[in-house]
UniProtKB/Swiss-Prot annotation:
HAMAP family: TrhO. Its EC number is 1.14.-.-. It catalyses: uridine(34) in tRNA + AH2 + O2 = 5-hydroxyuridine(34) in tRNA + A + H2O. The active site is at C178 (cysteine persulfide intermediate). GO terms for biological process: tRNA modification. Gene3D superfamilies: 3.30.70.100, Rhodanese-like domain. This is tRNA uridine(34) hydroxylase. Residues 124-218 form the Rhodanese domain. Belongs to the TrhO family. It comes from the Bacteria.
């Protein structure tokens, strides 16, 4: 019988003074706790996804919270029969999710969360436009019905798309979504900072939506791209056939 592997994804925007100093600590902790995956550290916070036993992934998360001083962490856990990562990587980055917009104050400019249970009703209202903030290769295999595809190759291209599509956005309620929520923290903050008032995002992203709602209204169509060896999951969160790497 295969061991049940926990996959923990978490992010937090928190001021880390010397993030480079944490790299050897988490490499050591991860090795001791048999953790595989990726931990990204930057002055603006941390973004991670790693796998191991349920007890060990939570112990590593606890260390992340304690050593960074974070008080607001977005966390998701799901499960697999095998590790979806090959090894542990701890990296220093300029941004924990790269959008390349200077001086974006996520604490001051925040979009409003829409809970997964309320998402279907909200996005089918009049005067609401739905934007998929992910990249085109992700959107190609699955997205929400009627969602706008900005056709970006990287998230750094999203601000330019916003500038080029102001006529589309003006006067609308703007609902955005991404895989796990972190890109929407920045995309909604960007829109709020340049004057859009009614800006919303799916709390916990697609992954939390699928877990909570089971896609009961079939508004999600296709598969969800994920950044690990599974590469894609179905709407019941099981790995999609034919996408696994390194099997």
């Amino acid at each position: 019988m295969n061991e049940r592997i926990a996959i923990l994804s978490a992010y937090s925007f928190v001021n880390i003074i010397e993030p480079a100093n944490l790299i050897p600590k988490f490499l050591l902790i991860g090795k001791k706790k048999y953790i595989r995956g990726t931990i990204l550290l930057a002055n603006e916070g941390f973004n991670c996804s790693f796998s191991g036993s349920y007890e060990n992934v939570n112990l590593v998360l606890k260390q992340l919270i304690e050593l960074t001083g974070s008080k607001d962490v977005n966390v998701k856990i799901n499960y697999s029969s095998v590790h979806p990562f090959q090894k542990l990587k701890v990296r220093l980055k300029k941004e924990i999710i790269a959008m390349n917009v200077k001086d974006l104050n996520i604490e001051v400019f925040k979009g409003d969360y829409i809970e997964p249970k309320d998402w279907d009703e909200f996005i089918t209202k009049q005067n609401v436009i739905v934007i998929d903030t992910r990249n085109e290769y992700e959107i190609d295999i699955g997205t929400f019905k009627s969602a706008i595809n900005p056709r970006t190759e990287t998230f750094k291209q999203f601000p330019a798309w916003v500038q080029q599509n102001q006529a589309l956005l003006q006067g609308k309620k703007i609902a955005m979504f991404c895989t796990g929520g972190i890109r929407c923290e920045k995309s909604t903050s960007l829109l709020k900072s340049i004057g859009y008032n009614e800006v919303y995002h799916l709390k916990g992203g697609i992954l939390q939506y699928l877990e909570d709602t089971h896609n009961k209204n079939n508004l999600w169509q296709g598969k969800c791209f994920v950044f690990d060896d599974r590469r894609a999951i179905m709407d019941d969160l099981s790995p999609a056939e034919g996408y696994w790497l390194h099997r």
